[in-house]
From Swiss-Prot:
Keywords: Amino-acid biosynthesis, Aminotransferase, Histidine biosynthesis, Pyridoxal phosphate, Transferase. It is an enzyme of class 2 (transferase). The keyword Transferase applies. The gene is hisC. This is Histidinol-phosphate aminotransferase. GO terms for molecular function: histidinol-phosphate transaminase activity; pyridoxal phosphate binding. Gene3D superfamilies: Aspartate Aminotransferase, domain 1 (3.90.1150.10), Type I PLP-dependent aspartate aminotransferase-like (Major domain) (3.40.640.10). It holds the Pfam family Aminotran_1_2. Transmembrane segments: none annotated. It comes from Rhodococcus jostii (strain RHA1). Belongs to the class-II pyridoxal-phosphate-dependent aminotransferase family. Histidinol-phosphate aminotransferase subfamily.
């Protein structure tokens, strides 16, 4: 069916009475293309094991018997399992009362800004960072205050605390490891941010399992009225299709989110599948070590070729410096390799994939380096 045959297609978004702060904005979205090598969305490339697939299938089958009933609106069993996982992974003795879950960490962040942001309030982030933070701020009518990182993309804590003191944001985002640069933020640095912040600090730990840095969870009892740690099962857990995000914080934060969450927001199917995935955490997370090893190998190969490689604690690598990053992105795509243009001039981001995928990426990079690097980036 052509556009002319689609009912209502004669108008565009600009013809709608949309909020002014959304007018002219672009929606979030990474290209979804069918190519031989997909390294653009930071998924775990290792598929679920047969045991996990079977467990999910059986768990969903059992849950389907109750599809005529609403799910547990507070997802108590799932939150209990998530708390147990966090205890094992971080050593911090959190309980079900410290944990909240939603449909991906983006919904977690949205609920937090619904409760603690909104009209007349502001949120600060240290850019470049996760591009959904300002989008969620716009969606909740929270003023977005971007503060730039250092030239090496690390967090400048002195500049961060000075900006917090000057602007006094209601919400501060700290992403560790940071997407798209890969840097982790140490506990001492987080303390300085928390001490300076007048409102809440959301530490986005979507890629925490890939990093050896201590989790911010260790600070919850020290900063109970300020600290929220958000996480996801989409990355290391290889559960991106399951859409499950969660947070850990003082119980009072969970009580606050109950005021803004939609009723029965997590389906019985999502809860059952996520609990099954958590039962297989050890086997799934075994791939993290392999991906970290591949990250080192790929980073060295890029460096040897002449790229500037930003050190990463995550499952992706930011690298450059390209004369034209958009043109370089297309050059990779022409070679069957899909990576991500994250909007940083001169740089692209590649997910660490399977060894064979990384080999194809390295071959493409060797070819592209000859024509796409700046003279400062080409050190070969």
């Amino acid at each position: 069916m052509t556009a002319a045959n689609v009912p209502g297609s004669s108008i565009g978004v600009d013809a709608l009475p949309i909020r002014e702060n959304l007018r002219g904005k672009s929606a979030y979205g990474a290209p979804q293309l069918t190519v031989p090598v997909q390294l653009n969305t930071n998924e775990n490339p290792h598929p679920p094991t047969k045991a996990l697939v079977d467990d999910v299938a059986e768990s969903v089958r059992e849950a389907a018997r109750e599809l005529h009933r609403y799910p547990d609106r507070d997802a108590v069993a799932l939150r209990t399992d998530l708390a147990a996982y966090l205890v094992r992974q971080t050593g911090v003795p959190v309980t079900v009362d410290n944990v909240w879950a939603a449909n991906g960490s983006n919904e977690i962040l949205q609920q937090l800004l619904q409760a603690f942001g909104g009209p007349g309030r502001s949120a600060m982030g240290f850019v470049p960072s996760y591009s959904m933070h300002p989008i969620i701020a716009d969606g909740t009518e929270t003023e977005w205050l971007p503060i730039f990182r250092r030239a090496d993309f690390a967090l400048d804590v002195d500049a961060a605390t000075a900006a917090i003191t000057e602007r006094r944001p209601d919400v501060v985002f700290v992403t560790s490891p940071n997407n798209p640069t890969g840097h982790s933020v140490g506990i001492a640095e987080l303390r300085r941010v928390l001490d300076a912040a007048p409102g809440i600090v959301i530490v986005d730990e979507a890629y925490a399992e890939f990093s050896d840095a201590p989790s911010a969870l260790t600070l919850i009892d020290e900063y109970p009225s300020k600290l929220v740690v958000s996480r996801t099962m989409s990355k290391a857990f290889a559960f991106a299709g399951g859409r499950l995000g969660y947070l850990a914080a003082a119980p009072a934060f969970i009580e606050a989110l109950l005021l803004v969450r939609l009723p029965y927001h997590l389906s019985v199917v999502t809860q059952a599948a996520a609990r099954a995935a958590l039962r297989h955490a050890n086997e799934t997370l075994a791939s993290v070590h392999a991906l970290a090893t591949e990250r080192v190998r790929v980073s060295k190969a890029l460096d040897d070729t002449g790229f500037r490689v930003i050190p990463s604690d995550a499952n992706f690598i930011l690298f450059g410096e390209f004369t034209d990053s958009a043109h370089a992105w297309r050059a990779y795509l022409d070679r069957g390799v899909l990576i991500r243009d994250v909007g940083i001039p001169g740089y692209l981001r590649a997910t660490v994939g399977l060894a064979s995928e990384n080999d194809a990426f390295i071959v493409a990079s060797d070819e592209i380096a000859a024509t796409e690097l700046t003279s400062s980036g080409d050190r070969g």
